[in-house]
């Protein structure tokens, strides 16, 4: 998609985001086009039904045409593969087919399932229509709850949370239209639901266990990440990215070994040199120099000076890493690493983070001991801007978010003009607790 955007000149090659390895190009019109394909409907009809339109109809159609012409040069996308599988794939016979998260399948994806089912003896569908939060991509929970035949079984007890979180989640669920009636019991365990007006009030790090810190849209997720970084928290996202540069962290660990009279391998030395200014010649930083050295060779401070062009005085060996790694390190990155090491220690920074900060959609299907939900949104996701059906869909999103929590649920409210009124849900919760 990024190559297409560059070729079609939708974004410029000078765009600063291109230097970010995590940057993913997304286009509103192409997203609506993909939704139409998943709904097996004319894109014009889907465009007209959208309450929020970022592009005119003319630009919308031109982007579709440009995208399809781009794909003619031997490119296919994921939706192409699904479409082609309906006509081209001969699915094998199966004894049992188990389909999880069935509420999130689109009509196009159901077409594939129907074809598979013709050769299946027994089929199990699992899902929750109240967590059907992919309508934006054409998903329709009714295929799961209504259209698909068979015996229905409703689970009577959650294995995740206690009464407090269960009660609060049901308050949100009351606003979901066409919800299949289902009563289930909570676990007999302690739990808590609390509300805050400031991120720094939330006891992140003080409560044991894992954390989900969740926002509705990427802009609010980025805001949460900045707050967490300012607080000196170690976190990641649901794609495995960490809150710091792992190459910088590897360089810190390499120099720490050197300063403790230990040796490092060739790979560690080569990476560390990317962050050291004091080299006899720039050639010692290039791949060509390291390529010619044996892989098994290890280096201490003296070896790096004698054979690898390190141009530091002997007394520098005992200096801390932040005085040596002065290249490709911003001051705020150095400060952040120092705070992390003081708070967590190297061993915890080598492990996966206990805190995940991401969108509600990204953690669907997951769970954490503690969950924080941020009510701030942007204009397209603002609750008050939506019609009755769209408000019901927003309720589904927040119901999904709060039911990720196992032990404690934390609500971060905002008076920003675009938001979900989770404070009102919390007020009802307090009134009903009395």
PLM features: residue spans?
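Helicase-core coupling region on the C-terminal RecA-like lobe
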Residues: 170-204, 214-231, 236-296
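Conserved helicase motor core of SF1/SF2 NTP-dependent helicases
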Residues: 96, 103-190, 212-227, 238-246, ...
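Flexible, charged surface loops at secondary-structure boundaries
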Residues: 90-94, 203-209, 403-404
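Conserved helicase C-terminal RecA-like lobe
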Residues: 257-412
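Amphipathic alpha-helical "lid/sensor" segments that cap RecA-like P-loop NTPase cores
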Residues: 21-41, 208-231
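Accessory N-terminal region flanking or inserted into the helicase ATPase core
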Residues: 9-98, 107-112, 125, 135
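Conserved P-loop NTPase-based nucleic-acid remodeling module centered on helicase motor cores
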Residues: 1-28, 229-232, 236-244
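Short, charged/polar "capping" segments at the starts of alpha-helices
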Residues: 417-424
């Amino acid at each position: 998609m990024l190559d297409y955007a560059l070729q079609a000149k939708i974004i410029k090659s000078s765009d600063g985001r291109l230097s970010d390895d995590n940057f993913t190009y997304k286009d509103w019109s192409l997203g609506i086009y993909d939704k139409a394909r998943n709904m097996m409907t004319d894109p014009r009809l889907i465009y007209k039904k959208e309450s929020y339109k970022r592009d005119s109809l003319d630009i919308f159609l031109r982007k579709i045409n440009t995208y399809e012409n781009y794909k003619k040069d031997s490119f296919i996308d994921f939706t192409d593969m699904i479409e082609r599988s309906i006509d081209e794939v001969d699915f094998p016979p199966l004894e049992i087919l188990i389909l999880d998260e069935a509420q999130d399948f689109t009509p196009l994806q159901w077409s594939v399932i129907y074809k598979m089912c013709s050769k299946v003896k027994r089929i199990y569908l699992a899902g929750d229509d109240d967590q059907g939060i992919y309508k934006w991509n054409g998903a329709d929970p009714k295929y799961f709850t209504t259209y698909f035949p068979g015996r229905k079984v409703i689970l009577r007890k959650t294995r995740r949370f206690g009464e407090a979180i269960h009660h609060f989640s049901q308050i949100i669920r009351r606003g979901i239209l066409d919800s299949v009636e289902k009563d289930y019991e909570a676990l007999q365990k302690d739990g808590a639901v609390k509300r805050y007006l400031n991120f720094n009030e939330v006891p992140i790090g003080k409560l044991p266990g894992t954390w989900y810190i969740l926002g509705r849209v990427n802009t609010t997720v980025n805001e949460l990440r900045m707050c967490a970084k300012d607080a000196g928290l170690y976190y990641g996202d649901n794609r495995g990215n960490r809150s710091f540069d792992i190459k910088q962290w590897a360089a810190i660990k390499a120099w720490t070994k050197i300063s403790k009279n230990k040796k490092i391998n060739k790979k560690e030395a080569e990476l560390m040199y990317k962050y050291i200014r004091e080299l006899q010649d720039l050639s010692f930083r290039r791949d060509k120099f390291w390529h010619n050295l044996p892989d098994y060779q290890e280096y201490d401070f003296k070896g790096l000076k004698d054979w690898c062009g390190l141009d530091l005085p002997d007394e520098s060996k005992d200096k801390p890493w932040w005085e040596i790694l002065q290249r490709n390190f911003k001051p705020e990155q150095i400060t952040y690493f120092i705070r992390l090491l003081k708070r967590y220690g190297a061993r915890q920074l080598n492990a996966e983070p206990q805190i995940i900060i991401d969108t509600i959609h990204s953690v669907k299907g997951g769970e954490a001991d503690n969950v924080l939900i941020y009510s701030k949104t942007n204009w397209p996701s603002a609750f008050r801007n939506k019609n009755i059906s769209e408000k019901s869909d927003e309720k589904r999103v927040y119901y999904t978010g709060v039911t990720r929590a196992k032990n404690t649920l934390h609500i971060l409210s905002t008076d920003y003009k675009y938001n979900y009124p989770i404070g009102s849900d919390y007020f009802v919760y307090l009134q009903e607790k009395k």
